[in-house]
């Protein structure tokens, strides 16, 4: 038997997001909102269940692509609308001692606060916070510090609307109690929905113990629209960057830097202003200069930028990447590429110098092709390498060349028209200066 099971409620339409995409698939620091919740859930339990409805297949496929073991259920929103109906959908074969019920739109929640809900002897523990502006939240009604009920904003009377103790939306139930009490919940309210919060009052009437656990309002912030999404992302960004800086990463003007929640750093790293790190990028002992973007790539013992762009699947080791250089699916090891180049679908080996304006022409209109450049190659400025092509070790390519054939070790490659100087032709074409 699992000590704790977790049910994540993610069946809502999320109409205030004004999007055809499910609310829980909107990204926060690079990952879908629901992924943040699932990762934290798996730190607590290996029995994690999620209840869906709106955009069911889309959300299901997204979740299962990353979390293979999660159990997915569909809510009957016609006959059993509301949070109690959602939780009810996930009760099948639930046999843990306790069940933690949380919302899928709370990506900032911390694991320690979820654990604190379950670490007591109450039959039901509910999360609550003191709000400066409680409008819109369910109110936690107390009598001599004991929880009596939770009342939703639209169902609250004038006195209840003055209460500042608000429901944070996470609950830990004794599992047997949860299974027995959900069928008793009625939909006698303004929305005609089955509220999970009504389980509190029903449990109290049966003599069960209910406790509220104070939590941080920010951590339990619900994302209901895109403005709230932007606020939550800023909070999460600050957490990510604070943690990285405390672990040795140097950031200049960190408010201008964006770091994906999946990115990893190791060793001595420095990020200058306006740097963007996306996906599961890995940065080790490297200096990322202003305005550079790194996507799903690996950078070790290198300096990048300013204004460089590493697109997905680039692997950079002991390399200098200068300004306005773009890489895509490129592997560079001990290479210098200082200026204004595109290096895509390529492998470049140690000691090679890439001249300004070098391009790997990797796409023929139908397929992508690979360029392989050996060791100690010198590529002059404004060179085009038409893939598929292999440049052997110790090759010298003259500036302005278009390389379409493989080279041999030690070759000089030059492909350009012969230069002709015609004496006096300027004056013939434009006339002499005194005639202008």
From Swiss-Prot:
Main location: cytoplasm
Region (Linker) residue spans: 227-247
Localization of this protein: Cytoplasm
Disulphide-bridged cysteine pairs: none
CDD domains: GT2_GlmU_N_bac (cd02540), LbH_GlmU_C (cd03353)
GO cellular component: cytoplasm; membrane
Superkingdom, natural source: Bacteria
Annotated spans, Pyrophosphorylase: 1-226
Record family assignment: In the N-terminal section; belongs to the N-acetylglucosamine-1-phosphate uridyltransferase family. In the C-terminal section; belongs to the transferase hexapeptide repeat family.
Protein name: Bifunctional protein GlmU
Protein encoded by which gene: glmU
């Amino acid at each position: 038997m699992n000590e704790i099971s977790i049910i994540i409620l993610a069946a809502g339409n999320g109409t205030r997001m004004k999007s055809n995409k499910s609310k829980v698939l909107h990204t926060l620091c690079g990952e879908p909102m629901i992924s943040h919740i699932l990762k934290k859930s798996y730190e607590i339990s290996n029995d994690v269940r999620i209840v869906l409805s709106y955009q069911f297949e889309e959300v299901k496929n997204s979740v299962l692509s990353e979390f293979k073991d999660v159990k997915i259920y569909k809510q009957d929103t016609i006959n059993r609308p509301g949070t109690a109906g959602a939780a009810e959908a996930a009760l099948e074969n639930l046999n843990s001692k306790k069940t933690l019920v949380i919302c899928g739109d709370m990506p900032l929640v911390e694991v320690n606060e979820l654990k604190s809900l379950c670490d007591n002897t109450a039959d039901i523990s509910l999360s609550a916070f003191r709000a400066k502006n409680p409008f819109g939240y369910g109110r936690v009604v107390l009598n001599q510090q004991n929880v009596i009920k939770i009342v939703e904003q639209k169902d609250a009377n004038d006195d209840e609307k003055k209460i500042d103790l608000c429901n944070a939306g996470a609950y830990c139930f004794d599992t047997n109690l949860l299974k027995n009490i959900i069928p008793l919940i009625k939909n006698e309210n303004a929305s005609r929905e089955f509220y999970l919060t009504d389980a509190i009052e029903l449990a109290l009437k049966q003599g069960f113990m209910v406790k509220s656990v104070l939590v941080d309002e920010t951590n339990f912030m619900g994302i209901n629209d895109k403005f709230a999404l932007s606020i939550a992302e800023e909070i999460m960004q600050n957490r990510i960057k604070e943690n990285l800086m405390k672990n040795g990463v140097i950031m200049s003007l960190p408010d201008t830097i964006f770091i994906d929640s999946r990115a990893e750093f190791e060793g001595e790293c420095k990020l200058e202003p306006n740097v963007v790190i996306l996906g599961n990028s890995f940065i080790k002992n490297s200096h990322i200069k202003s305005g550079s973007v790194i996507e799903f790539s690996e950078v070790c013992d290198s300096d990048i930028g300013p204004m460089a762009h590493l697109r997905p699947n680039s692997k950079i080791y002991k390399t200098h990447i200068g300004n306005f250089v773009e890489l895509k699916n490129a592997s560079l090891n001990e290479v210098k590429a200082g200026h204004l180049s595109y290096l895509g679908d390529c492998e470049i080996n140690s000691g090679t110098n890439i001249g300004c304006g070098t391009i790997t022409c990797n796409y023929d209109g139908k397929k992508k092709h690979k360029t392989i450049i050996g060791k100690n190659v010198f590529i002059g400025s404004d060179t085009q390498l038409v893939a598929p092509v292999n440049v052997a070790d110790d090759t010298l390519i003259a500036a302005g060349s278009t390389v379409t054939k493989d080279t041999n070790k030690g070759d000089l490659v030059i492909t350009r028209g012969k230069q002709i100087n015609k004496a006096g032709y300027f004056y013939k074409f434009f006339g002499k200066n005194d005639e202008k």
